[in-house]
Structures are given as C-alpha cells and as structure tokens.
C-alpha cells in the first residue's frame, strides 16, 4: 500500500466491554434500595442515562422507582448536609492614629 492511502487507515484499538449496570435477574422496584441507590449522585440527583449506561426503558423504570421511594420516605429527597466548620472571624482592633 502506498503512503497516501496509509494515512487514512485507523488503528484498531481493543476495547473492554463493560458489564451492564442492571443484570437480567435484578428487579427494578422502589423497595430495592441497594439497586436504586447506585443511580443517585452524591447530591441526591438522579443520574442521566449516559452516566448510568441504561436503556431508555430501564432509565424510566429507575426514575419512577426513585420517585416512589422518595415519596414513601425510603430514600431522602436531599442527602444529609455536610456540616462545615465555620472559620472564626477575627474582629478588627481599633487603633488610634
């Protein structure tokens, strides 16, 4: 093959196939908190389909299950707020000039 055609060839990279996040035996249900909590972010938001790598149908079922679990207070609407220590503010000393 001459050099001009060699420039357009792409190198074949090997890739590792990722396992699906929901196995065939897993049941998407609002009572299955261990499964549902994998699809919630640190802030308590429902993660997007791209992040989850779910199908449209699975994402819809997960979203409905999360909302049901929140309403039935199995999951919090907001996670517990982290308590930050407030820095002590120093008062200005008044100087007489």
From Swiss-Prot:
Name of the encoding gene: rps18
Taxonomic source organism: Oenothera glazioviana (Large-flowered evening primrose)
GO molecular function: small ribosomal subunit rRNA binding; structural constituent of ribosome
Protein name as annotated: Small ribosomal subunit protein bS18c
Subcellular localization, as worded in the UniProt entry: Plastid, Chloroplast
Any Pfam family hit: Ribosomal_S18
One biological process term in Gene Ontology: translation
Cellular component, GO annotation: chloroplast; mitochondrial small ribosomal subunit
Keywords: Chloroplast, Plastid, Ribonucleoprotein, Ribosomal protein, RNA-binding, rRNA-binding
InterPro entries noted in UniProt: Ribosomal_bS18 (IPR001648), Ribosomal_bS18_sf (IPR036870)
Subunit: Part of the 30S ribosomal subunit.
Protein family membership: Belongs to the bacterial ribosomal protein bS18 family.
Lineage: Eukaryota, Viridiplantae, Streptophyta, Embryophyta, Tracheophyta
């Amino acid at each position: 093959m001459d050099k001009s055609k060699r420039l357009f060839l792409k190198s074949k990279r090997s890739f590792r196939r990722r396992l699906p996040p929901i196995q065939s035996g897993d049941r998407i249900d609002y009572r299955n908190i261990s499964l549902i909590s994998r699809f919630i972010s640190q802030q308590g938001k429902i993660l997007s389909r791209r992040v989850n790598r779910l199908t449209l149908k699975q994402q819809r079922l997960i979203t409905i299950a999360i909302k049901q679990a929140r309403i039935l207070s199995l999951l919090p609407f907001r996670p517990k707020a982290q308590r930050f220590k407030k820095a002590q503010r120093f008062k200005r000393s008044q100087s007489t000039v």
